[in-house]
């Protein structure tokens, strides 16, 4: 049986806690008591952050999405590929010239925030003529961000640049290579290869264990799956 007096005593002895919030713009503020009204007067503003998850353990390799394409998809394939050279990585992978060359990555889909494209035509003189075809789609790693509305543009770029005679590869990266890029690639597998969400997520994690779409993105992927009528 619950002892109300004991619970009341424990509650009175509890220490006041401070909760830190970060909004989509990167503004950080602290609330002294989460049970109190979250008003402007109850907030303590902190230093701003970048507005995205910062990767504290940089890695500079692109990870291939290992998948066997179903024969039914190959039979109705408009891209003429027998394998898909899709890669995922962090922003560091997008700067690794040697790795990009070794993996025949000719195109990069940049879905991060504030990340420069290094191997552009304008920079070819300082990169020994090495040129990458880029597409920038800015996506915030925020649970309230509508990522579904970005899918079509991402799919179009991937379809336009993947495969070919040389079976060129495409790297999809964000800042940390964890949430945004994973969500885009999962949605692509769902849409183009008819692979259910759960299996698509498993495929991404087997290629790059760090992959973890935020909860808001996962909810949107569930909605997207229902729209695809699996």
From Swiss-Prot:
GO MF terms, alphabetically ordered: JUN kinase phosphatase activity; protein serine/threonine phosphatase activity; protein tyrosine phosphatase activity
GO cellular component: cytoplasm
Keywords carried by this UniProt record: Hydrolase, Protein phosphatase
Catalytic activity: O-phospho-L-tyrosyl-[protein] + H2O = L-tyrosyl-[protein] + phosphate; O-phospho-L-seryl-[protein] + H2O = L-seryl-[protein] + phosphate; O-phospho-L-threonyl-[protein] + H2O = L-threonyl-[protein] + phosphate
GO biological processes: regulation of JNK cascade
Gene3D superfamilies documented for this protein: Protein tyrosine phosphatase superfamily (3.90.190.10)
Residue ranges constituting the Tyrosine-protein phosphatase domain according to the UniProt record: 78-230
Its EC number(s): 3.1.3.16, 3.1.3.48
InterPro entries xrefs: Dual-sp_phosphatase_cat-dom, Prot-tyrosine_phosphatase-like, Tyr_Pase_AS, Tyr_Pase_dom, TYR_PHOSPHATASE_DUAL_dom
Enzyme kind, highest EC tier: hydrolase
Active site residues of this protein: 174 (phosphocysteine intermediate)
Stored SUPFAM superfamilies: (Phosphotyrosine protein) phosphatases II (SSF52799)
Protein family: Belongs to the protein-tyrosine phosphatase family. Non-receptor class dual specificity subfamily.
Its biological purpose: Has a dual specificity toward Ser/Thr and Tyr-containing proteins.
Name this protein carries in UniProt: Probable dual specificity protein phosphatase DDB_G0283417
């Amino acid at each position: 049986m619950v002892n109300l007096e004991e619970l009341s005593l424990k509650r009175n002895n509890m220490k006041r806690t401070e909760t830190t919030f970060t909004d989509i713009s990167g503004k950080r503020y602290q609330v002294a008591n989460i049970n109190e009204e979250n008003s402007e007067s109850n907030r303590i503003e902190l230093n701003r952050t970048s507005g995205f998850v910062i990767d504290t353990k940089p890695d500079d390799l692109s990870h291939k999405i290992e998948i066997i394409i179903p024969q039914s998809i190959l039979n109705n394939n408009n891209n003429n590929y027998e394998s898909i050279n899709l890669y995922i990585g962090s922003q560091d992978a997008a700067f690794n010239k040697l790795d990009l060359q070794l993996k025949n990555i000719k195109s990069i889909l940049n879905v991060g925030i504030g990340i420069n494209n290094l191997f552009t035509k304008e920079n070819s003189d300082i990169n020994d003529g090495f040129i990458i075809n880029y597409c920038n789609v800015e996506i915030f790693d925020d649970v309230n961000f509508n990522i579904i509305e970005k899918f079509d543009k991402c799919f179009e770029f991937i379809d336009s640049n993947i495969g070919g005679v040389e079976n060129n590869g495409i790297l999809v990266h964000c800042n940390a290579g964890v949430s945004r890029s994973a969500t885009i690639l999962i949605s692509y597998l769902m849409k183009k290869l008819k692979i259910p969400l759960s299996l698509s997520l498993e495929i991404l994690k087997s290629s790059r264990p760090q992959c973890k779409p935020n909860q808001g993105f996962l909810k949107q992927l569930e909605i997207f799956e229902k729209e695809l009528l699996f």
